[in-house]
Amino acid sequence: MKVLLHLPALLASLTLLQTAASASDDPTAETDIIHDTVEEVKVWVNKAFLDSRDRLKMAMTTKIHSTRHLSDYLKHAKGRTRTAIRSGQVWEESLKKLSQFLTNVTGQGLDLTLLSWEAGCDPPAPTMTCNISSPYRTITGYCNNRKNPALGSANRALARWLPAEYEDGLSLPYGWTPGKMRNGFPLPQPREVSNQIAAYLNEEDVLDQKRSMLFMQWGQIVDHDMDFAPETEMGSDTYTKAQCDEHCIQGDNCFPIMFPPGDPKLKTQGKCMPFFRAGFVCPTPPYKSLAREQINALTSFLDASLVYSPEPSLANRLRNLSSPLGLMAVNEEVSDNGRPFPPFVKMKPSPCEVINATAGVPCFLAGDSRASEQILLATSHTLFIREHNRLATELSRLNPHWDRETLYQEARKIMGAFIQITTFRDYLPILLGDEMQKWIPPYQGYNESVDPRISNVFTFALRFGHLEIPSTVYRLDENYQPWGSESELPLHTVFFNTWRLVKDGGIDPLVRGLLAKNAKLMHQNKMMTGELRNKLFQPNHTIHGFDLASINIQRSRDHGQPGYNSWRAFCGLSQPKTLEELSAVMKNEVLAKKLMDLYGTPSNIDIWLGAVAEPLVHRGRVGPLLTCLLGQQFQRIRDGDRFWWENPGVFTEKQRESLQKMSFSRLVCDNTGIDKVPLNPFQANAYPHGFVDCSSIDKLDLSPWASVKE
């Protein structure tokens, strides 16, 4: 079906200059103009993407490195994700060019369906046939919903629970145009907000007396299993990333974070922190909105995709296809006291080698490109591949007639259930506290009318976890005492730090630290440690770090996020308008005044900051707004997942009973040299109180998976 857009309406939204030129009445004229324009745009968009990849490779081989290079490595789009983002870039740039010189090409409007086809956007029709009888998820998440196979699959737009809010109604973020008002007030610079609200002078952390480091780390695991929005490239044939990196020149997809007067970073890092906008996808029929929509490169489901990847080609590379046992590939060069590490990435040199050239240990290859971002995350990935291989090996003993594919898929299915169970049984109740039942009622079965897509706002709600990260990572010995001469590692030294795992102790000392050390408490007066607020991706003294709080604020504007009060209204909460009302919501007059001085109105407070600033709910670790946003999202990914572990038919009744015995403590017992673990690993634990021998921890009984060969 031909979908048309009346151009005057578009131009009002784009605020672009329009010439008086008009095309011929020839019905082929529009087709030719669209084709020629898209082909022209493709040339320089493709060049920008190629240049970016080459520049990243070159950056890793030079002796002068920057925080930007390390960030680029994490946020660099690959495979199908890269293709989807490139098509979105071509679509948007082509639309801008067409709107500059066309008035009414055919007398009816611009054919957006044709434009989408020329730009390489996904066709509306399904691109694959779904095997509705398959007991296994697809790698991409496609076919989960039988009526709408693409729902929740990888490389689609994040869902909008509220309409996007951009300066121009289309793509420009608020804060882009100097002096531009929002709700009658100018927006403050993100770094200024960070300096005044997120910082604290005394760097001593306020530790959470009831939550372990594992509680913090599990939040990142869940996040990396459900959402990832890589950055896009420059949108212009004349503007380069170098201009953004080196000269802080705002333009196209460069949106630098400027340092305010008096900021200490002005002396060491110049005028700004470089910031590139998130990748986005083409609009989809029926084109009711042309506002920029950011991509989710992952499946929306809690399915262990961080272990297995949502990208089919990578998923295959992560497997040991030479083994008949359905195993994941492991590192053939190094091991951890005989236990496997993940394979190394092939990129030479990788950022992990760059930050410690002497050690020369590459980053790990995993289902998620961020696996080596920090040492505790790399430790978690190591545990997961070990557990997969343990499960696959045990299943092969039970079912020697099963082929490699069945063993792989069954182990993968169990791993997905483990992450689901651990998240909903152990993590969410102590995160959402007394509010959990309000937002996540007991499971009633799969509902195909529930939209499981990750919402755009959820990608900011989950960033509350940044305020739970302490300034130190601990390594402990078998008696849970300090391990070696460097038992306490400053947080900024563990980014891209695989060499510590491979050459300095393995994962066991770090796992003990996860179990026996405390998370940081999310505190209104001590929000974010300076290790993240000033030293993000600063692995050594030669590289100056980023500010994660500023990035979160700038990213929310990049995504066109509505402000604090809009989300309070969405959740049925009060919308403060005055200092007194905001003070009552925050239960903190000093904080409320700082926010009002910066933003002018509570309506303008950036969603991430407003949400994390709220006082915690009873027995939880987030405030009322976050319990709403997090609770609704987790309810949707559970009820809208056809392969949810509790959905009848996914597992047998006996298998479900057995799966409930799985626990993180058992995962540790089965895949490390640790023999004493806490009964409640997500709660704060002080050894030996609450610790038991591994023989006291329930094991997963795999006998319900035994089958008789037909």
From Swiss-Prot:
<feature type="modified residue" description="Phosphoserine">
    <location>
        <position position="313"/>
    </location>
</feature>
<feature type="site" description="Transition state stabilizer">
    <location>
        <position position="370"/>
    </location>
</feature>
<dbReference type="GO" id="GO:0036393">
    <property type="term" value="F:thiocyanate peroxidase activity"/>
</dbReference>
<feature type="binding site">
    <location>
        <position position="301"/>
    </location>
    <ligand>
        <name>Ca(2+)</name>
    </ligand>
</feature>
<keyword id="KW-0349">Heme</keyword>
<feature type="binding site">
    <location>
        <position position="303"/>
    </location>
    <ligand>
        <name>Ca(2+)</name>
    </ligand>
</feature>
<feature type="binding site" description="covalent">
    <location>
        <position position="373"/>
    </location>
    <ligand>
        <name>heme b</name>
    </ligand>
</feature>
<feature type="binding site">
    <location>
        <position position="225"/>
    </location>
    <ligand>
        <name>Ca(2+)</name>
    </ligand>
</feature>
<dbReference type="InterPro" id="IPR019791">
    <property type="entry name" value="Haem_peroxidase_animal"/>
</dbReference>
<dbReference type="GO" id="GO:0016323">
    <property type="term" value="C:basolateral plasma membrane"/>
</dbReference>
<keyword id="KW-0597">Phosphoprotein</keyword>
<keyword id="KW-0408">Iron</keyword>
<feature type="binding site">
    <location>
        <position position="299"/>
    </location>
    <ligand>
        <name>Ca(2+)</name>
    </ligand>
</feature>
<feature type="disulfide bond">
    <location>
        <begin position="248"/>
        <end position="272"/>
    </location>
</feature>
<keyword id="KW-0964">Secreted</keyword>
<dbReference type="GO" id="GO:0006979">
    <property type="term" value="P:response to oxidative stress"/>
</dbReference>
<feature type="propeptide">
    <location>
        <begin position="24"/>
        <end position="80"/>
    </location>
</feature>
<protein>
    <recommendedName>
        <fullName>Lactoperoxidase</fullName>
        <ecNumber>1.11.1.7</ecNumber>
    </recommendedName>
</protein>
<keyword id="KW-0479">Metal-binding</keyword>
<dbReference type="GO" id="GO:0005737">
    <property type="term" value="C:cytoplasm"/>
</dbReference>
<feature type="disulfide bond">
    <location>
        <begin position="130"/>
        <end position="143"/>
    </location>
</feature>
<comment type="similarity">
    <text>Belongs to the peroxidase family.</text>
</comment>
<feature type="binding site" description="covalent">
    <location>
        <position position="223"/>
    </location>
    <ligand>
        <name>heme b</name>
    </ligand>
</feature>
<comment type="function">
    <text>Heme-containing oxidoreductase which catalyzes the conversion of thiocyanate (SCN(-)) into antimicrobial agent hypothiocyanous acid (OSCN(-)) in the presence of hydrogen peroxide (H2O2). Also involved in the conversion of iodide (I(-)) into hypoiodite (IO(-)) in the presence of H2O2. Responsible for the inactivation of a wide range of micro-organisms and hence, important component of defense mechanism. May be implicated in airway host defense against infection.</text>
</comment>
<dbReference type="Pfam" id="PF03098">
    <property type="entry name" value="An_peroxidase"/>
</dbReference>
<keyword id="KW-1015">Disulfide bond</keyword>
<dbReference type="GO" id="GO:0042742">
    <property type="term" value="P:defense response to bacterium"/>
</dbReference>
<dbReference type="GO" id="GO:0020037">
    <property type="term" value="F:heme binding"/>
</dbReference>
<keyword id="KW-0963">Cytoplasm</keyword>
<keyword id="KW-0944">Nitration</keyword>
<dbReference type="InterPro" id="IPR037120">
    <property type="entry name" value="Haem_peroxidase_sf_animal"/>
</dbReference>
<feature type="disulfide bond">
    <location>
        <begin position="669"/>
        <end position="694"/>
    </location>
</feature>
<keyword id="KW-0575">Peroxidase</keyword>
<dbReference type="GO" id="GO:0005615">
    <property type="term" value="C:extracellular space"/>
</dbReference>
<keyword id="KW-0929">Antimicrobial</keyword>
<dbReference type="GO" id="GO:0004601">
    <property type="term" value="F:peroxidase activity"/>
</dbReference>
<dbReference type="GO" id="GO:0046872">
    <property type="term" value="F:metal ion binding"/>
</dbReference>
<dbReference type="GO" id="GO:0140825">
    <property type="term" value="F:lactoperoxidase activity"/>
</dbReference>
<dbReference type="InterPro" id="IPR010255">
    <property type="entry name" value="Haem_peroxidase_sf"/>
</dbReference>
<feature type="signal peptide">
    <location>
        <begin position="1"/>
        <end position="23"/>
    </location>
</feature>
<feature type="modified residue" description="3'-nitrotyrosine">
    <location>
        <position position="480"/>
    </location>
</feature>
<feature type="binding site" description="axial binding residue">
    <location>
        <position position="466"/>
    </location>
    <ligand>
        <name>heme b</name>
    </ligand>
</feature>
